[in-house]
Amino acid sequence: MRYYQGSECTFTNLFVWRRCYRICWAISHEFLIIKVTRNDITFVLQPFGGDDKDLPAVIEELKKTFAGKSIEMRGIYEESIPLLKRCLTETTQFAEDRDNWDYVYLRDNLANLAGRKYHAKKNHANAFRKENPDYVFSAISEADITDCIAFADLWCEMKGQNEEGLRCELCALEEALNNFKNLNIRGALIRINGIVQAFTIGEKYNDDMAVIHF
């Protein structure tokens, strides 16, 4: 079971969201087990690593841990389903979790915005350039962190800081910014009249993929 292409598998993702989602982990038969609690729902991610032959023992340990309660597993890769079905009971239900699918784009498509599919995005970008001819786009450096955090705080306040989901996202975002160098992540920002108006944070995932966290 070594099909780890999802954004939830990055250390950065697990680290910055650990408080909001009460993320904890354990090792069982060389498998990494990640437990998450979100909106009072507790679930585990697909077990990572280990030898396929040991997965049934891991499932049995999970059953004991959940003390007879149903186990909800998320972040399952399509390639893993046949193996999981062999380890689980016939009453186990599998369902698509489309709301949590990752969006996957080719770099060249986003860089060029060619074709009808990206027409609206290209128009939006062109309108922004026309309205803000003096905007400055640059990579985020440590000198920009304070300004980015201030902008994130303002964004949360404008969106409704009392909403739990926004407070959670702000907490994760500030974790990423405050640990920018240690996490080895990268980012870019836009300033208009010297003031940060937008930024993004991501990291290289493997040889042919990057993950955009925010």
Regions found by a protein language model. Give the residues of each.
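Acyltransferase donor/substrate-recognition loop-hinge adjacent to the catalytic core
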Residues: 90-163
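Hydrophobic, proline/glycine-rich low-complexity stretches
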Residues: 1-6
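Short, glycine/charge-rich beta-strand/loop segments that flank catalytic centers
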Residues: 69-87, 98-102
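Conserved donor-binding loop and adjoining core beta-sheet/short helix segment
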Residues: 9-79, 191-214
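Short, conserved active-site entrance elements at the starts or edges of catalytic domains
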Residues: 143, 147-195
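Amphipathic coiled-coil/heptad-repeat helices and related helical stalk/stem segments
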Residues: 55, 121, 172-173
